[in-house]
């Protein structure tokens, strides 16, 4: 009997030890990054695997679908294993997630920055999120196709000249074998290009006129006719049927441009790697020009440059996971592997060890700036309840494009929707 009891005690001890060591393994520091940029998912996955291989620290990267970051973040933060690293791109995001944003003012990664101009700070001046890259967007041009159609970049200096070139190409699309614009898709993967980035144009000019630098309670929509100008040009000079834009995807638009079926493609510097890599486009055949919409003096406009790409570290994560996350970020911005990925995938970054970006669109942005052109800053960072407001604009654009509604629905969503969402956000 004593032998049996001793044996049972030994078994219990072994099981207890196993459970203890299992618990220790589960408590090892780790990093969970909820990535904002679908186009950079593969690069982040590769970098995370490399870091884990070198350090033994597990890094998990999950990428939210385009246009669904806020809802994905909300769902993930409610889980027991929440992101330790996430996106907090503007003051509205900080208002939503202030309790989750660790003070990064004295973090080693923050001290590696060359400027704090775009960092997100709270009312006390504490840095709650750091800007890890600066981007530009505009109209990407296949200059080889443009020249094949008998035109050149030098012709396009404002909306009137852009319209003339685009309409000529569209009229001869069958003969040329390509059209003017890639599809202006309004499905969830693509709509942000137009409810956010294109809608920035009327916001920017209205805010500039009125010296608005903080989120306003209301907007007038003074430049919505200009928004209509460029939207009409997009949807009426493309191979895509405007009736079907609600199901047209980001991938379809990229493929149309990347495979030589369209001359113009509204998107940003983040597409450089995909266009030259996945689609094998010749870098010499790519350029980015401003989005012209008929505003007086737009001949002096540059690209739309700014950022909403800001890292925040989860203040509610364990101290061990916070440290692991900060160590990972420091490695990303100082190591050869990390800085090379950032240069290749993200373009312009403001860290001391940053490599020169190979991204030609970043060079285009700098060329406009050097020529004295004004930057079209990212006014959309002031949008209240961003995803809800944008969904209203998308609904208006969808109905208008399909012929089941008129432009007034877009105006209502833009102006009245702004006031409604501001009130909802600010109480």
Which residue ranges define each predicted feature?
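Short, solvent-exposed loop/beta-turn-alpha elements that line the ligand-binding surface or hinge
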Residues: 103-117, 155, 185-188, 203-229, ...
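Extracytoplasmic/periplasmic substrate-recognition and gating elements
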Residues: 54, 79, 149, 278-344
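Conserved C-terminal helix/tail region of periplasmic/extracytoplasmic solute-binding proteins
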Residues: 147, 171, 336-339, 358, ...
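Hinge/lid segment of periplasmic solute-binding proteins
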Residues: 89-147, 193, 197, 285-290
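Extracytoplasmic/periplasmic solute-binding protein
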Residues: 128-132, 137, 163-216, 262
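Glycine-centered hinge/linker elements that transmit conformational signals in sensory
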Residues: 166-167, 213-247
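Extracytoplasmic "Venus flytrap"/periplasmic binding protein-like
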Residues: 50-115, 144-150, 157, 263-264
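Short, well-ordered beta-strand elements
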Residues: 27-38, 57-62, 85, 128
């Amino acid at each position: 009997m004593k032998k049996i009891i001793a044996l049972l005690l030994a078994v219990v001890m072994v099981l207890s030890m196993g459970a203890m060591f299992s618990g220790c393994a589960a408590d090892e520091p780790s990093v969970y990054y909820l990535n904002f940029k679908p186009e950079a998912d593969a690069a982040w996955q590769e970098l995370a695997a490399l870091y884990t291989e070198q350090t033994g620290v597990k890094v998990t990267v999950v990428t939210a679908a385009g246009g669904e970051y806020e809802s994905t973040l909300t769902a993930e933060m409610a889980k027991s294993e929440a992101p330790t690293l996430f996106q907090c791109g503007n003051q509205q995001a900080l208002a939503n997630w202030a309790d989750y944003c660790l003070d990064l003012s004295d973090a080693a990664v923050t001290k590696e920055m060359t400027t704090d101009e775009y960092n997100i700070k709270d009312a006390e001046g504490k840095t709650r999120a750091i800007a890890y890259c600066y981007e530009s967007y505009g109209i990407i041009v296949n200059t080889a196709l443009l020249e094949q159609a008998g035109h050149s970049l030098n012709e396009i200096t404002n909306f009137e000249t852009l319209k003339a070139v685009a309409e000529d190409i569209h009229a001869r699309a069958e003969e040329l074998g390509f059209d003017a614009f890639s599809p202006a898709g309004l499905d969830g993967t693509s709509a942000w290009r137009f409810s956010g980035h294109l809608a920035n144009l009327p916001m920017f000019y209205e805010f500039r006129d009125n010296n608005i630098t903080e989120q306003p309670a209301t907007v007038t929509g003074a430049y919505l006719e200009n928004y209509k100008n460029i939207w009409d040009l997009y949807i009426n000079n493309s191979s895509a049927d405007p009736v079907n834009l609600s199901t047209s995807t980001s991938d379809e638009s990229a493929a149309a441009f990347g495979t030589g079926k369209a001359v113009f493609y509204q998107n940003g510097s983040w597409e450089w790697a995909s266009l030259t890599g996945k689609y094998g486009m010749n870098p010499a055949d790519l350029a980015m020009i401003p989005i012209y919409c008929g505003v007086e003096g737009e001949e002096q406009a540059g690209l739309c440059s700014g950022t909403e790409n800001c890292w925040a570290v989860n203040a509610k994560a364990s101290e061990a996971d916070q440290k692991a996350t900060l160590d990972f970020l420091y490695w990303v911005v100082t190591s050869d592997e990390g800085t090379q990925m950032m240069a290749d995938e993200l373009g312009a970054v403001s860290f001391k060890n940053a490599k020169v970006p190979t991204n030609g669109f970043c060079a285009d942005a700098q060329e406009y700036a050097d020529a004295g052109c004004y930057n079209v800053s990212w006014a959309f960072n002031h949008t209240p309840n961003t995803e809800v407001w944008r969904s209203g604009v998308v609904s208006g654009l969808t109905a208008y494009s399909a012929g089941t509604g008129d432009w007034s629905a877009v105006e209502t969503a833009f102006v009245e929707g702004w006031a409604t969402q501001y009130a909802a956000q600010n109480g």
